């Protein structure tokens, strides 16, 4: 017996949509949604394909996701070609199976079933889909959100289909995410010969005490919803490669994953104060890729918890751990945002896979969420 969720997932996997190339995935989704009465507005920007689709009026529940995937890596190490979906022992293998073509298929099939049962639903059901999430994320969801906000669109609830689960579907639901702030720091010195240090100024030596203090800072202790803010040095570089040249500059890149206990401005001020304390000559470049956001217990969280418990008989953990997602852009609209998707154990890995029955379960959960909020 065929399963529409599995079949649609397989159709999507067969399209090698390496970010930001959609490779025809959205055309499949659009065709299915239009067939059940959705109005679809393509919102393509540059090399990125996006669409906004809706059906009905009133309080709005949007489902958000991305059709793009990361590269497959060494295809010889896959048990089957990464863009040829294969089911083995109940597991569906293929790039994007878990992140996040399985979720997209579950969303669309859930919407089809929901509309069939509730053709005159009271609220508005919507989809926000992009092909630019895995790479730069510059022409995707963020641009669609900006356009929707500019024309006064209202979004009350948003379910993002990112693979949130840990062991079984729904055991972890993300009801927020930490902010992400990157600092590109250059410490300036004076290049010279290592045998004549008095004629040079080594930026590595000057910066070492400051960096030592930086990595030891306790930024906050987190709170009920967020773990403590963390700072990690990601890249550090100095020198010419020669063993007899004192470097002229030291380049350090570090990233903060910060909680709602801090703002990006508070972090910036503290870093600058530290640089001034050690009397360093420096250049700073900051990149804020996302503010922290949190969806407290309310109608959306309650609907998600109810759906998970109904079909999997477990109470999900509400967590804010992990990296950033497009939820950070959608939260700007004032919407309640929650992430619920398949198990994330193999995402971005060789032999990415998802339990086929989990996708069927996910479609039922998504449909129940629709029924609770916009039926």
From Swiss-Prot:
Coiled coil: none annotated. It catalyses: N-succinyl-(2S,6S)-2,6-diaminopimelate + H2O = (2S,6S)-2,6-diaminopimelate + succinate. Pfam families: M20_dimer, Peptidase_M20. Its EC number is 3.5.1.18. One of its GO terms (biological process) is diaminopimelate biosynthetic process. It comes from the Bacteria. The active site is at residues 68, 133. Pathway: Amino-acid biosynthesis; L-lysine biosynthesis via DAP pathway; LL-2,6-diaminopimelate from (S)-tetrahydrodipicolinate (succinylase route): step 3/3. The keyword Glycoprotein does not apply. One of its GO terms (molecular function) is succinyl-diaminopimelate desuccinylase activity. Zn(2+) 1 binds at residues 66, 99, 162. Keywords: Amino-acid biosynthesis, Cobalt, Diaminopimelate biosynthesis, Hydrolase, Lysine biosynthesis, Metal-binding, Zinc. Zn(2+) 2 binds at residues 99, 134, 348. Homodimer. Belongs to the peptidase M20A family. DapE subfamily. This is Succinyl-diaminopimelate desuccinylase. The lineage of its organism: Bacteria, Pseudomonadati, Pseudomonadota, Gammaproteobacteria, Enterobacterales. The gene is dapE.
């Amino acid at each position: 017996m065929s399963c529409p969720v599995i079949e649609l997932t397989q159709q999507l996997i067969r399209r090698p949509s390496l970010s930001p190339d959609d490779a025809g995935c959205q055309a499949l989704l659009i065709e299915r949604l239009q067939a059940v009465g959705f109005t679809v507005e393509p919102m393509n920007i540059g090399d990125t394909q996006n669409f906004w689709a809706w059906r009905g009026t009133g309080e709005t529940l949007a489902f958000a996701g991305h059709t793009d995937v990361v590269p497959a890596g060494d295809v010889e190490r896959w048990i089957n070609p990464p863009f040829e979906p294969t089911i083995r022992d109940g597991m569906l293998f293929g790039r994007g199976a878990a992140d996040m073509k399985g979720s997209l298929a579950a969303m669309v099939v859930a919407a089809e079933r929901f509309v069939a049962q509730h053709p005159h639903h009271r609220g508005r059901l919507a989809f926000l889909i992009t092909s630019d999430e895995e790479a730069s994320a510059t022409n995707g969801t963020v641009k669609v959100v900006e356009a929707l906000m500019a024309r006064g669109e209202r979004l009350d609830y948003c379910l993002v289909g990112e693979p949130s689960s840990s062991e079984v579907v729904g055991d972890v639901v993300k009801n927020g995410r930490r902010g992400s702030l990157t600092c590109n720091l250059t410490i300036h010195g004076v290049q010279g010969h290592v045998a004549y240090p008095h004629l040079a100024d080594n930026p590595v030596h000057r910066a070492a005490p400051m960096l030592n203090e930086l990595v030891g800072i306790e930024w906050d202790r987190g709170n009920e919803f967020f773990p403590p803010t963390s700072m990690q040095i990601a890249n550090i570089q100095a020198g010419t490669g020669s063993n007899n040249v004192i470097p002229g500059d030291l380049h350090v890149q570090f990233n903060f994953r910060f909680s709602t206990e801090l703002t990006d401005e508070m972090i910036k001020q503290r870093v600058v104060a530290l640089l001034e304390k050690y009397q360093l000559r420096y250049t700073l470049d900051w990149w804020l890729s996302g503010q922290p956001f949190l969806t407290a217990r309310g109608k959306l969280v309650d609907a998600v918890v109810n759906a998970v418990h109904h079909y999997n008989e477990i109470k999900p953990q509400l967590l804010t751990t992990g990296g950033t997602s497009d939820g950070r852009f959608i939260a700007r609209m004032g919407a309640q945002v929650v992430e619920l998707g398949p198990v994330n154990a193999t995402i971005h890995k060789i032999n990415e896979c998802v339990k086929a029955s989990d996708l069927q379960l996910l479609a039922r959960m998504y449909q129940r969420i629709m029924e609770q909020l916009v039926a």
